[in-house]
């Protein structure tokens, strides 16, 4: 733990790392405040900041020789088998750590690896290689199962705690498992933080992008006051500002054989309105719509658009073009609407809901992994990151207002490597509510652009229904389709 004055060079380095964003740190009084250049306060500079050799320092950090927190249950024959790219990551990590040890730098590394890379199994291999007692911290209970499976495969003694940290502390008085798998809210307990700081050497922060370490959170405080000897941040979409806490990054590109297609399903709608819609439209320009809350609420009650989404999904699913579908909404009521309507069509053997308010949802997710055909309806908050259903082959994005990090994480749900190579994403840029027409079109175009430019998707026009119609279509219908295409091209 290093308390330093905020000199110009230090401030400039921190500012560059956060891409010019405001910097907040703990000061010498323990207050979490925004850092100003030339401040008279001393600030607690996170240990992980010094992991990069580009940061000059005279500080000397402890090495692993000063602790004896070694794994007792390790069996080298249980080490997981890795793909060549995963082995390359391990090689890079080991090489970097040797340099860090030689230079007496903190052993803190961010593994910036694409969705579907296999971060969990790769990290378990590293964990077994290091042979040090480990704490795995996840943002929610949904991620527990995939870690449990891999840790058990390696044969490591472990303990899972997702509820009360007090009961866990009582158990730790009599036993100290080699691996602790916990949810991040456990870090609000100072006694628990002190315990793992003393008895564990490796801290793994899964889905590190879900934490904004420029906020005064439990994870921020833990990394500042109780840092372990070693640390991995795992993410496919790193937050720039989080580098202050883990300032060494390994990023290896992943080549994929997946055939990834994104369809923009357009339609021309007559203007649609209700009393509720007119009431919400009045709030579009108010401060309460700063984060487009009412924009998304309007989408959730846009009946013609909702029907288009349902019609598209039903037709594609019935045709066998897609088989394992994830339907994502922003709002819970929107999720429930789609769930109920799909349930009426396909029944409970096919349609499932990923509801954060249902404690049994994680068990349900496990149960559908091996199904050949299913439709899983959930929210962006619950299933947009970390959802572990590798067999998903298609994604329906029913919302529009999504930031770039969320887009990349969400599309990653259907980019896991399996024997089946086709992956399909459907987005819906049209709306029948004229007041949000251009806003929705722009947001959906951003989803398309990121998927194509960064994630290797190919955009294709969704006109299968029109093209499959008989040639002897009435002239009026053909004219309507032509006008529809012209309208939507102008809209985009």
From Swiss-Prot:
Keyword terms, alphabetized: ATP-binding, DNA-binding, Helicase, Hydrolase, Late protein, Nucleotide-binding, Transcription, Virion
SUPFAM superfamilies per UniProt: P-loop containing nucleoside triphosphate hydrolases
Which GO molecular function entries does the Swiss-Prot or TrEMBL record give? ATP binding; DNA binding; helicase activity; hydrolase activity
Q: What is its main location?
A: virion
Q: What is its EC number?
A: 3.6.4.-
Question: Start and end of every Helicase ATP-binding domain?
Answer: 100-256
Binding residue positions for ATP: 113-120
Which Pfam family, just one, is annotated for this protein? ResIII
Question: In the UniProt record, does the keyword Chloroplast occur?
Answer: no
InterPro entries on file: Helicase/UvrB_N, Helicase_ATP-bd, Helicase_Restrict-Modif_Enz, P-loop_NTPase
- Kindly state the positions of the motif DESH box in this protein: 206-209
Compartment(s) of residence:
Virion
A Gene Ontology cellular component where this protein is annotated is: virion component
Query: How does the record describe its quaternary structure?
Result: Interacts with G2. Might be part of a transcription complex composed at least of G2, A18, and H5.
Give the similarity note: Belongs to the helicase family. Poxviruses subfamily.
User: Any idea what job this protein has?
Assistant: DNA helicase which seems to act as a postreplicative transcription termination factor. Involved in ATP-dependent release of nascent RNA. Forms a stable complex with single-stranded DNA, and to a lesser extent RNA.
Protein name from the UniProt record: Transcript termination protein A18
């Amino acid at each position: 733990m290093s308390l330093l004055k905020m000199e110009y060079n230090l401030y400039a380095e921190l500012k560059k790392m956060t891409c010019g964003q405001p910097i907040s740190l703990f000061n010498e009084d323990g207050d979490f405040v925004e850092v100003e250049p030339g401040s008279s306060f001393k600030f607690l500079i996170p240990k992980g900041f010094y992991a990069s050799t580009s940061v000059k320092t005279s500080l000397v950090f402890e090495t692993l020789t000063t602790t004896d927190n070694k794994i007792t249950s390790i069996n080298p024959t249980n080490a997981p088998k890795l793909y060549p790219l995963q082995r390359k990551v391990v090689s890079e990590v080991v090489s970097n750590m040797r340099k860090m040890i030689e230079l007496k730098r903190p052993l803190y590394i961010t593994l910036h690896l694409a969705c579907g890379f296999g971060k969990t199994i790769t990290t378990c291999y590293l964990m077994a290689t290091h042979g040090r007692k480990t704490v795995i911290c996840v943002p929610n209970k949904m991620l527990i199962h995939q870690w449990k499976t891999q840790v058990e495969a390696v044969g490591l003694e472990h303990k899972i705690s997702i509820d009360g940290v007090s009961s866990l502390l009582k158990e730790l008085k009599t036993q100290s498992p080699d691996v602790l798998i916990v949810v991040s809210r456990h870090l609000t307990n100072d006694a628990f933080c002190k315990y793992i700081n003393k008895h564990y050497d490796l801290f793994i922060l899964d889905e590190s992008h879900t934490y904004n370490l420029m906020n005064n959170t439990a994870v921020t405080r833990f990394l500042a006051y109780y840092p372990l000897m070693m640390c991995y941040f795992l993410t496919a979409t790193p937050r720039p500002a989080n580098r202050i806490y883990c300032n060494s990054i390994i990023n290896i590109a992943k080549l994929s054989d997946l055939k990834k297609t994104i369809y923009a399903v357009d339609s021309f709608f007559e203007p649609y309105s209700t009393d509720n819609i007119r009431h919400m439209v009045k709030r579009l320009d108010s401060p309460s719509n700063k984060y487009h809350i009412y924009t998304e609420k309007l989408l959730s009650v846009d009946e013609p658009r909702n029907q288009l989404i349902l019609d598209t999904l039903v037709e594609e699913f019935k045709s066998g073009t897609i088989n394992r579908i994830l339907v994502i909404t922003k709002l819970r009521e929107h999720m429930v609407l789609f769930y109920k309507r799909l349930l009426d069509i396909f029944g409970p053997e096919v349609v499932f809901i990923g509801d954060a308010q249902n404690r049994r949802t994680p068990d349900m997710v496990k149960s559908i992994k091996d199904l050949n055909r299913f439709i899983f309806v959930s929210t962006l908050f619950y299933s947009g990151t970390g959802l572990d259903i590798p067999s998903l082959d298609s994604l329906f994005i029913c919302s529009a207002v999504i930031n770039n990090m969320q887009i990349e994480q969400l599309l990653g749900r259907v980019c896991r490597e399996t024997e089946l190579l086709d992956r399909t994403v459907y987005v819906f840029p049209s709306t029948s509510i004229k007041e949000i027409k251009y806003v929705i079109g722009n947001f959906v175009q951003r989803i398309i652009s990121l998927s194509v430019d960064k994630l290797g998707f190919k955009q294709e026009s969704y006109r299968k229904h029109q093209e499959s119609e008989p040639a002897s279509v009435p002239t009026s219908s053909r004219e309507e389709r032509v006008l529809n295409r012209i309208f939507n091209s102008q809209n985009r």
